[in-house]
Amino acid sequence: MIDRYSLLRPWLFCIDPEKAHNLTLSNLDRAQRWGFLERLITKPINDPQVLCGIEFSNPVGLAAGLDKDGKYIDALAALGFGFLEIGTVTPRPQPGNPKPRMFRLPEAQAIINRMGFNNDGVEACVARVRCSKFWQNGGVLGMNIGKNASTPIEEASRDYILAMEAVYEIATYITINISSPNTQNLRALQGEEMLRELLGSLGEARKHLCDRHGVRKPLFLKIAPNLDQGDINLIADLLLEFGIDAVIATNTTISRDAVKGMEFGEEAGGLSGAPVRNASNIVIKALKARLGNQLPIIGVGGIMSGVDAREKIMAGASLVQLYSGLIYRGPDLVYKCATVLRQP
């Protein structure tokens, strides 16, 4: 598949990034529905990993953001991922930020986006999840939740609780996204006072949902790379205090040091891809040093090869997730990463 993708990529890179993104996913979905995709993709790697009571078929997952609305679940599952994370979804539909809002920086193997949680709303996404064969067959599917842009930051807990209630029945795990730079003030939720309030509220809501549904769903927290040691230690301690089950490190960065002077390098938004790799690894190592084996870490950020995926595991992650690497390396990156991670 990678050879085919290397032929397609120059053509895709001539198209507006967001249009290319949607076109690629639509064609993947069409190929999957017609039965062609499985013939083009290398057989998935079976390398079971158990984390938070969940069995992942292999340790390579899809990061949130690629399929925000659950429209392409079965097509993406066919690429060989061990798990998928859908979203970010919000309680109410919202259009996101004005276009253009996605930019490629090929020289740095990077993407800048300021999408702004554009999505059809959590209820529409849940309906699509229920229709997917992947979910019906018991595939591991995380739901990434956020707050609406119109909701004041002081009332953020309300939105997260509404979204959690909506996805609870269909999610294998639920990720609390407080680290996107594209929703005003969202990252303020990583501060001690607001994070305590949010995690406490979600913990209470989960207890009620557990009683109602008879099952305790794991809660993961996704954090930013732009954190100092004190911030990381504080967040790690709060995760343990409030019974959060895992941490995803990291989201996109607001730093532009690695892309200075490049076309689009000064665009507002979150920078992902190769430039965030080291920053993500540093956060993972710091979390591991603080948490030890008390809480698992999922590593994401800048994985462009199997070696990069291995670095995340060596830094302290138990699983990894891909996004920008798929844009630059193509679907075969899933197989390559899973193959390297299966090796002793």
Swiss-Prot record:
Q: Pathway, per UniProt?
A: Pyrimidine metabolism; UMP biosynthesis via de novo pathway; orotate from (S)-dihydroorotate (quinone route): step 1/1
* GO CC terms: cytoplasm; plasma membrane
Q: What is its EC number?
A: 1.3.5.2
- The residues listed in the UniProt record as binding FMN, with positions renumbered to this chain, are 64-68, 88, 144, 177, 222, 250, 273, 302, 323-324
Print the keywords alphabetically: Cell membrane, Flavoprotein, FMN, Membrane, Oxidoreductase, Pyrimidine biosynthesis
First-listed, main subcellular location of the protein, grouped into a coarse class = membrane
Residues annotated to bind substrate = 68, 113-117, 177, 182, 251-252
Q: What does it do?
A: Catalyzes the conversion of dihydroorotate to orotate with quinone as electron acceptor.
Q: What is this protein called?
A: Dihydroorotate dehydrogenase (quinone)
Q: Which organism is it from?
A: Polynucleobacter necessarius subsp. necessarius (strain STIR1)
Q: Which gene encodes it?
A: pyrD
